[in-house]
Every structure is written in structure tokens, then in C-alpha cells.
Amino acid sequence: MADQDPGGISPLQQMVASGAGAVVTSLFMTPLDVVKVRLQSQRPSVASELMPPSRLWSLSYAKLPSSLRSTGKCLLYCNGVLEPLYLCPNGARCATWFQDPTRFTGTMDAFVKIVRHEGTRTLWSGLPATLVMTVPATAAYFTAYDQLKAFLCGRALTSDLYAPMVAGALARLGTVTVISPLELVRTKLQAQHLSYRELGTCVRAAVAQGGWRSLWLGWGPTALRDVPFSALYWFNYELVKSWLSGLRPKDQTSVGISFVAGGISGMVAATLTLPFDVVKTQRQVALGAVEALRVMPLNTDSTWLLLRRILAESGTRGLFAGFLPRIIKAAPSCAIMISTYEFGKNFFQRLNREQLLSP
């Protein structure tokens, strides 16, 4: 097979192996991803950032029918895009029926409250979008990584030590650019539990307001999170895998070694890049605010300004919001993904050898 890589399998077989790993990983890890997104998206109401509360009330109250403008009447504004807005003309809580949106105090609290108030199925919200995004993206990413690493090492463009870092960064940069719109859709589904119709309205409004570039909202922080993550992950993975392989007999399977090396490398990379994950989540969750309130945002902060604002508002803890679910997700998901991928590659290697030996 002339198109096989040095590992003995073709790019198509690499894509099948990595795609299967993406499906298995998504099924196991989506609940943790949902909890992470919910924890990270907890912040002051988007409405309060767009304009002062007094102006927001005056604009909303002026549009009410006269029958609802009498003293003491309250309005619960909810269009499925933003969190409900509780509006009262005298500034008091004059209605006991209104309950504040659910707040989460931690990972286990989020799990319990999501299941109790929204049902178990909510933990897998956004799974279809996740699969549509992750299967082709992961297949392209892992295949590109292996091909780039072989190319760099084969032509001595970089040392074998740093080839995984360079190949991982380049492969992830291309993948992030292609899947950024689907990442935005998945984040909205998980964070605000929108129906697909509401999500479509939200996306169309954003495109009408900011053009097609709005679909790449969050590309900057996503790239800042994923490209360094990929570089760190593959660099550490190859080092840990090489070290562990030297401790075990060569005739033993490498899948277990890949599982351990992938988990350790994923945990380290996830910790170092978590602040950019928080920025990416908060920026993407804000999609739809303009459509819901019919107002223009005061400004669009850069990634670094958002980092400083989060640090000023919530301290270091805010930059590492969702730390536990991200680490709990990153370690096993990286371990499952890479070990499944290695298992698939081993399977195709054996299959190819048998085909070569068969008459």
C-alpha cells in the first residue's frame, strides 16, 4: 500500500480509527462538558453589561401594554435566548412566584441540580452537534498530526523531540478554524438549553447583525486554548509514552501505556490553558444578547481585556472556573481517545500484515 504512513496504515485507516475514538469519547464525556460550560457561563447578566439597569427597565417598560404598566406590576422577560430578566418598576421583589435562575456552587451541585430540574437527558444536550463536529474534526486532526510528524521527522525539519509539538500545533490550528462555527453552536446548546428553532433564530440574528464573521465569535480564545493545548499535549504524550515504554517488555500491548500517557498529558495541558477556555465560553454564550434586547453592546472586548476583566471581577478563581470538571473530563477523555486511536491503528496494522501475507 503506497499511501501508508511509516506506522503501516493508510491515512483513511487513521481517520477511521480516530473517528471511532471520537464517538466513544463523546458518549462518555459530554455530561462533564455540559457541567463545565454551565459553571463557566455563570456570571452577571449579559443585560447588565449592555446598559444600566434603569435604562433597561425604562426601555422594556415603555413597550408594555397599558394594562401592565400600573404600579406594582412585574414582568418576567424570557425569550429562550437570555436568562430570564425580572423587571419591576419600583425596584422591589413584588412577586413571590419568580424564582432566580438556578445557580451552581460546584461540580456535584451542578450535576444534581441539572438532573433534578431539567432531567438526565440534559446532561447529553448538544450531543448531536458534538458528534457532527468532533467526528470529522478529530479524524482530520489526528490524521494531520501523524502525517505532519512523519513529514517533519522524515525531512529533518525539526528534532524528533519537538516534532510532536510543532505537528500538534499546526494540526489543531487548521481544525479550529474549520469547526469554530459548530463549536459555537454546541456551546449555546449546552449553556442555555435552547431548542434548535431558538438556536437558529439566535444565529440568524447574529449573522444579520455582525455578518458571517460572527459565526467565528470566540475563534481567538478557542485557538489560544486549543493550539497551545495540542502542542503541550503531544509533546508530553510522546515523552511520557517513551518513558513508560522503556519500563515494560516490548512484546506487551501499547494501548495501556497510551491510556496512562494520554491521561497525564491531557491533565497538564488542560490546567495550563483553562483561562482561555473560560474566555471562549463566556464570549460564545453572549451570542443572541443583541437580538434579545434590541440594543447595541457598548464594546467588544479583546481576549486579553476579557481576561483582565474576569480577573478583576472574580479573581484567579474566575479564570479557573470549571477547573474540576475540565480536569475530570480532560484526563479520561484524552486517555480514552488516544488509547482507542492506538487500538484502531494496531487493528489496521495487523489487518494489513495479514493481507500482505495472504496468498
Swiss-Prot record:
Enumerate the Mitochondrial matrix topological stretches.
Answer: 36-121, 186-214, 277-317
Query: Is Cell inner membrane given among the entry's keywords?
Result: no
Task: Give me the Mitochondrial intermembrane side stretches, as residue ranges.
Answer: 1-14, 143-164, 236-255, 339-359
Sample GO molecular function, one term = metal ion binding
**Would you say which domain of life the source belongs to?**
Eukaryota
Q: What is its main location?
A: mitochondrion
For the keyword RNA-binding, the answer is: no
Stated membrane topology is: Multi-pass membrane protein
Sequence similarity: Belongs to the mitochondrial carrier (TC 2.A.29) family.
Q: What role does it play? A: Mitochondrial transporter required for glutathione import into mitochondria. Glutathione, which plays key roles in oxidative metabolism, is produced exclusively in the cytosol and is imported in many organelles. Mitochondrial glutathione is required for the activity and stability of proteins containing iron-sulfur clusters, as well as erythropoiesis.
Q: What protein name does the entry list?
A: Mitochondrial glutathione transporter SLC25A39
User: Organism source for this protein?
Assistant: Bos taurus (Bovine)
